[in-house]
């Protein structure tokens, strides 16, 4: 049947710029989905997904990736290359379950559930990793850049503020039940940070790394932009 294919042992599938490897794979051409088990990995331009099992939903024309569901030991990587004077970015997320949506070849949304944590950094400052940790992560992207993040359930976050001359001025540190962060994607900077309390005490502060004695509350506003 040309509409359905299955393969076993050292499976490698190449499809419109996407490479899939696994031990067991199923490809339903009619319904536009791919299911993988056994060390599955999905590689596409600037993105990599891995976990215990992966389910891919293709676009209606079958040429692109619409969404991906990774179940157990989920790991997602996104790398945006440098553009003109703007450095490239590296984002990683981990958790029990990961769901990703794509717009063309760009990641538009990333949702991680249970034991969720992640980080991202700019390629010229790899030692300054911006951290996220909680029960759940819900990240949205614009043109490949992170635009909004919601961290829920014993949420923690750390984000560095980088000046125009590419020196690190300070960092935001936040704790709470839920943390909402809005970014300025074109600047790779935190625009606003809000912390909600509940079962866990909430706090948000900005630490000036140029003057380590200077610490101020940042619960409502993330960076001194």
Feature-to-residue mapping (PLM):
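Mature-chain termini and adjacent capping regions
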Residues: 1-225
